[in-house]
Amino acid sequence: MQQLEQDFPGNDIDDIEDLISAEDVKPQERYQNKKSVTVRAKKRVQIKPETDAEEKPTPRPTIYESVIPGTQKVFVKTWGCAHNNSDSEYMAGQLAAYGYKLSGKDEADLWLLNSCTVKNPSEDTFRNEIESGMSNGKHIVVAGCVPQGAPKSDYLRGLSVIGVQQIDRVVEVVEETLKGHSVRLLQNKKVHGRRVAGAPLSLPKVRKNPLIEIISINTGCLNQCTYCKTKHARGDLASYPPEEIVDRARQSFAEGCCEIWLTSEDTGAYGRDIGSSLPELLWKLVEVIPEHCMLRVGMTNPPYILEHLEEVAKVLQHPRVYAFLHVPVQSGSDSVLGEMKREYCRKDFEHVVDFLRERVPGVTIATDIICGFPTETEEDFEETMTLCGRYRFPSLFINQFFPRPGTPAAKMERIPANLVKKRTKRLTDLFYSYEPYAQRVGEMYTVLVTEISHDKLHYVGHNKSYEQVLLPMRDNLLGTRVHVRITSVSKFSMVGEILDDERDWTRCAKKQEAPMELTITGRNRDKLIQRYVGIALVVGSLAFLLQLLIRFL
């Protein structure tokens, strides 16, 4: 399996993307108004390709005018959430299927940069990477939420852009860019006039981790959070049909994956636009998960999971579903939540956590906090501290507020930076004051081993609660399910020793033969390249004969 820039995804939980408008309505009222919402696509102005040469950066030299497509090297880099990572894998898969070679940045002819708009620092590094590529004579194609949400940004002028719903057209954009052209595809996809979730899930992939399939079950959301820029890029909720998601899961297991991550801007809102629901989808997926394989449910905001708590709790108890849920609270203050337009109250969040902890043995709840939101008072922050101190979340993602251009929160009066840093430090100190795994030494678990640790010194497995267990790097261990005993612990993980002999390690049920078009590796990729080269030679020969015929006549 060809790899992207990194060998495997990191051990962090990446899909932490909460997704703006006004109208001061109470959170519960706003939520009640949306319970029967039908999402309709908004008309958007099509952005035409750049034609003003004076506004463009110095064009890169044209390196591709060959009749043989896909003979260059492409470097792919991704920022942001699991949804973005999945999009990059799809784009890499199509490029590989067409014959392009995925490579490191130095040897690449073209850089494909897939961006994230959640925070200022990630956009800053994205901009710096563009400048680096341009200064090194690379052709640049940008993708993701930054150009989709702010396509007229000065530093994007003259660059080719792939919109978040146009990733299935990456090959033609790359080809035209290599010819020296600038192409911008930012339109929404529609079927019978209705906006759909995006590119087909059946596209080929080059997975960053060949053992893990990331499936985007919907794009966009139903929220209007005042701090969020992602809403500008991903838009309103649009869900994939359950059958398409199940087919993708089945195909992924057939290709050798042993773990599936469901991701979106809000998995809890899944299906509201198509007459389905998250529990309905989960029960259908459970039916196709092979023995010893696992499913992880992605981030869900509190309002939309409240209606389905009973069913979600039952699904999380299933032996092939991780007892894990990421539910971002963002603040422990009802006042701040109202200013954020989060559409729930603190008690709603507490009910979700209490219910799941009572019904799902060993469940892990992860959450997010934004420190220093413009309206946050000292009393508001103390409520957040109390909430986090009560639940002692094993996974707590602490973020300083960043004013994103074009959002209502960016127009609010900001809290002094030193006060934001002080509050962030206090909450961070609280988080590090407790050890979630302190009493685990000697405990035994069954773990599924799917990743390599950041330091490249251990394999990483997860138990039923999706808690990290570091294991020695032994041959043939990746992709297996093993029994372990915990020998030591740290703040974020446990270290285990393997109790089984290698002959007792178990793998996912034997994979089926996968269709060639979805397996872009080794022999199949070579066949595809040979096919394109053969077609090109035939076309070239016909052109040569036609030219001779014209001269003769």
Curated annotation (Swiss-Prot):
Biased composition (Basic and acidic residues): 23-32, 47-58
Entry membrane topology: Single-pass membrane protein
Cofactor(s) it depends on: [4Fe-4S] cluster
Ranges for domain MTTase N-terminal: 72-179
Designated name of the protein: Threonylcarbamoyladenosine tRNA methylthiotransferase
UniProt-annotated stretches for the region Disordered: 21-61
Gene Ontology cellular-component terms listed: endoplasmic reticulum; membrane
UniProt domain Radical SAM core: residue ranges: 207-438
Organism in which the protein naturally occurs: Drosophila pseudoobscura pseudoobscura
Any one GO MF annotation of this record: N6-threonylcarbomyladenosine methylthiotransferase activity
Lineage of producing organism: Eukaryota, Metazoa, Ecdysozoa, Arthropoda, Hexapoda
Protein family (similarity comment): Belongs to the methylthiotransferase family. CDKAL1 subfamily.
EC identifiers of the protein: 2.8.4.5
Gene3D superfamilies (UniProt xref): Methylthiotransferase, N-terminal domain, tm_1862 like domain
Keyword presence, Transferase: yes
Location(s) in or outside the cell: Membrane
Enzyme class: transferase
Catalytic activity field: N(6)-L-threonylcarbamoyladenosine(37) in tRNA + (sulfur carrier)-SH + AH2 + 2 S-adenosyl-L-methionine = 2-methylsulfanyl-N(6)-L-threonylcarbamoyladenosine(37) in tRNA + (sulfur carrier)-H + 5'-deoxyadenosine + L-methionine + A + S-adenosyl-L-homocysteine + 2 H(+)
Keywords recorded for this protein, A-Z: 4Fe-4S, Iron, Iron-sulfur, Membrane, Metal-binding, S-adenosyl-L-methionine, Transferase, Transmembrane, Transmembrane helix, tRNA processing
First-listed, main subcellular location of the protein, grouped into a coarse class: membrane
